[in-house]
Amino acid sequence: MPNHAEQLAQELNLSVKNVQGAIELIDQGNTIPFIARYRKEATGSMDDQVLRDLGDRLEYLRGLDKRKEEVTASITEQGAMTPELTAALTKAKTLAEVEDLYRPYKPKRKTRASIAKARGLQPLADAILQQDAAFDPEKAAADYLNEEVPDAAAALAGAQDIIAEAVSDDAACRAELRRYYRAFGRIASAKAKDEDSVYAQYYDFAEPLNKIPGHRVLALDRGEREGFLKVGIQVDAERAAGIVSWMFARKKTGGASAAVVDAAARDAYSRLIHPSLENELRGELSAAAAEGAIKVFGDNLRQLLLQPPIRGKTVMGLDPGYRMGCKVAVVDPTGKVLDTNVVYPVPEFKRVDQAKKTIKAMVLNNGVEVMAIGNGTAGHETEEFAAEVIRELAEEKNLHLQYMVVSEAGASVYSASKLAAEEFPQYDVNLRSAVSIARRLQDPLAELVKIDPKAVGVGQYQHDMPQKRLNETLDGVVEDCVNSVGVDLNTASAPLLRRVAGVSAATAKNIVAWREEEGAFTSRAQLKKVKGLGPKAYEQCAGFLRLPEAKNRLDATAVHPESYAAAKALLDACGYTAAEIGTDRLAGLPGAVKAKGAGTLCALLGVGEPTLNDIVAELCKPGRDVRDSLPKPLLRSDVMGLDDLKPGMELTGTVRNVIDFGAFVDLGVHQDGLVHVSQISDKFIKHPRELLKVGDIVRVKVLSVDTGKKRIALTMKGVPQQN
């Protein structure tokens, strides 16, 4: 089987040597986070996203190789393989090309052509295809009459069917038409039902295949699936049929036979080729659109998971509701539940005063510093209530609290899950969601890993995606995020541990069980005692599991145990000790390394320069968190309503979702505003992701407010952004 390193290197603009190194590491069963972090010398420091792209493409190419082998075996078994066909199959770069080459040899169901062949009309078709000017098809057809072929017209019709299928099966013809469709084809839609719907804009719609954005393709697919739209591909049918005829019919020299071939070619186009290409190209559009949407979902999920935690704060979580009340939970800085309650802050229940007393008492008794408010049903009323309580506490107790509206997407799913029941068996389902909302503010990553990634509310058309591919991508994103941050071995939950490279769900439970039976881990080496965690799993996971209080200070860092000897030798060579890891004294380590020379130290330690740089960074700042450099969450102390917004107002908000046509920004009015892609920058950008990501803090200007439809149009053009 081909190696593919050269092709992948060219496609991804990487060196062949590094691609080969990455392929070997993947084939050896190493995880992507491990390769990205601890095998940089072999890959040229490819990051996890590049490695995943490489892995996906490698899987496609190997699937292509396998299909070529299957097709070759089938054609060879039929005794139809030729050197030319072998060369064409070897050269084919896509599955579509392989299937085009296989089409004439592929076992077919009963067709008009197969019926004609069974009636003995293949020789007549072959003779007509020769297009000899002296040949008279109608006269020759008389020689093929039988019980099933009553006259010359029937014989010619059967021969034409055979020729049409041969034309349709021709790989060169399909390739030429495919190019034509891609260059000049349009996807078009019309209404299938006489009724208004959300698809009204597509009732008379057409857009070039090579220009239509993915989100419109997905909208058309959904509208068709729901029965509101009729969707197809439009081209100049006469011109397309003419291309087919031009490729097969020799009109100037072929005599009467050429007319039959011309008719067969045009029939092949309208009856066989167009429907087939329409399905194929629409499938390609849908697949590309789905892949694009999955990428957007993955990017949004990555930013959501990597939102900076609010550390060291006691947080009150409020899960708003009407009939069931507002569920309240207070958690300490470690996430431990201190207090719970249910209040009714919505005015219509006439229990607002009692709700205020309860909340104030919980704040004062537990030292609450921040409130996290869910954005679901009754969210705005609860936000107004919380802002009023904060104002009163400032006046009455000189206590200055802040709050943040938190997405509660997936909270109800989690609260009713088996996992939540195991974690909080003593609490009602509704109170569990309040705990989850509070913890999301404290550490979004640790809390959100407990929820199915599809439920966190940052995707588009996610239910229309190929679910296997969507799950693989989102699971990869979660894994990359967890490992880029690192996990405290002694406090991490089983759901968080199972996202660590090399750790299965069963092994994660075994780690937790070991802690419960043996007490806290005191060294990474103790991981080897955990049931089911063998040498390979230990190699993959050890560097991502941290012990901040460990006696061996290296266990608190991202330095892999395989590099401990090198780290200690580095410290010794530069005049430091392991006891000084993480202290101010090690601030001079980078300078000492520079003075001695990286090359000299690499030779002494037996490591590459990327590993040396990582070791130095970790020794200076053990367990550093990549999230600390990102924009901090936007906390508020007062509330605005939709009616307070006026065109021209400039506000600060948080990007909540990025999709193909724009970004939704939380302004603190309980209704996200839309910055259309055309309003993001004064310069042209193709996709909002070029400038925005989930969690970004941005300045925006209000363009318009539609209170009836609850729509806010925003712009970033001409609005200075804070650095």
Question: Can you say where each PLM-predicted feature lies in the sequence?
Answer:
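A glycine-rich phosphate-binding loop feature that marks nucleotide/adenosyl-phosphate handling sites
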Residues: 179-186, 318-322, 376-378, 405-413, ...
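Low-complexity, acidic/Ser/Thr- and charged residue-rich accessory regions of DNA metabolism proteins
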Residues: 143-146, 150-152, 205-208, 222, ...
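Accessory alpha-helical DNA-binding modules that contact the DNA backbone or grooves
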Residues: 31-32, 47-146, 150, 484-629, ...
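C-terminal accessory/binding modules appended to enzymatic or scaffolding proteins
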Residues: 13, 308-309, 479-513, 637-675, ...
